[in-house]
């Protein structure tokens, strides 16, 4: 809790712990979801288990290898690139803060508590953000959103009524649980009513009505 107040004091420029509590109340009153503008939500990401996401280091290496030029460019590329820039910078600042706090704490138990809190709580949020934006840039936002919905449906379906393997993002069109409209065979097969041919008299009357 002392570390949390310290973070709030630094970020809010508040000189006292009481002021940090005021900052905390202000933050709790705001309904900020970093995925809303991209069509997703924190709840949708929460269906994926924590061990699904790679480590922050692996995700940062992937972002650097694939999109370093775009991330370092002064030009605006996409909202996902902008979000990735902010996530990378925030993670760097968080690591600097954690290092500073860990260095200035004399108690080893407190230092271990700081490292554990950052890795367990804040680390997961950063892993989710990095994975989401990298995946959207790699596979496309629509496919990633479809995957999240498909995985959510799969994980909430009882094991006896769902496929044994979870959906895989790279092969989603073949294994997805929730399919888009127009992809099923039934929609491609015309109904018996459509196959019936209309008589010339009926077609003639319909053409006259359309002219009117």
From Swiss-Prot:
The answer to whether keyword rRNA processing applies is no
Q: What biological process terms from GO does the record include?
A: microtubule-dependent intracellular transport of viral material towards nucleus; symbiont entry into host cell; viral penetration into host nucleus
Identify the main location. secreted
Can you say where the sequence repeats lie in this chain? 184-190, 191-198, 199-206
The Basic residues compositionally biased stretches are 180-205
Any one Gene Ontology molecular-function term assigned to this protein's record:
structural molecule activity
- The protein's name is External core antigen
Organism encoding this protein: Hepatitis B virus genotype D subtype ayw (isolate Australia/AustKW/1991)
> What high-level taxonomic lineage is stated for the organism?
Viruses, Riboviria, Pararnavirae, Artverviricota, Revtraviricetes
């Amino acid at each position: 809790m002392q570390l949390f107040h310290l973070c709030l004091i630094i970020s809010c420029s508040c000189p006292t712990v009481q002021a940090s509590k005021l900052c905390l109340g202000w933050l709790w009153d705001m309904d900020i979801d970093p995925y809303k503008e991209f069509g997703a939500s924190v709840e949708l990401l929460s269906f994926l288990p924590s061990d699904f996401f790679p480590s922050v280091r692996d995700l940062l290496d992937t972002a650097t290898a694939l999109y370093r030029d775009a991330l370092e460019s002064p030009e605006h590329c996409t909202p996902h690139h902008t979000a990735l820039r902010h996530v990378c910078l925030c993670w760097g600042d968080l690591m600097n803060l954690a290092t500073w706090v860990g260095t200035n704490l004399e108690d080893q138990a407190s230092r271990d508590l700081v490292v554990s809190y950052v890795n367990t709580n804040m680390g997961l949020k950063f892993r989710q953000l990095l994975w989401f934006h990298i995946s959207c840039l790699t596979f496309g936002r629509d496919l990633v959103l479809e995957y999240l919905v498909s995985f959510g449906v799969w994980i909430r379906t009882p094991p006896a009524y769902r496929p044994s393997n979870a959906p895989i993002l790279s092969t989603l069109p073949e294994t997805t649980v929730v399919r888009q409209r127009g992809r099923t065979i039934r929609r491609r097969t015309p109904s018996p009513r459509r196959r019936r041919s209309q008589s010339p008299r009926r077609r003639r009357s319909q053409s006259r009505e359309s002219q009117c």
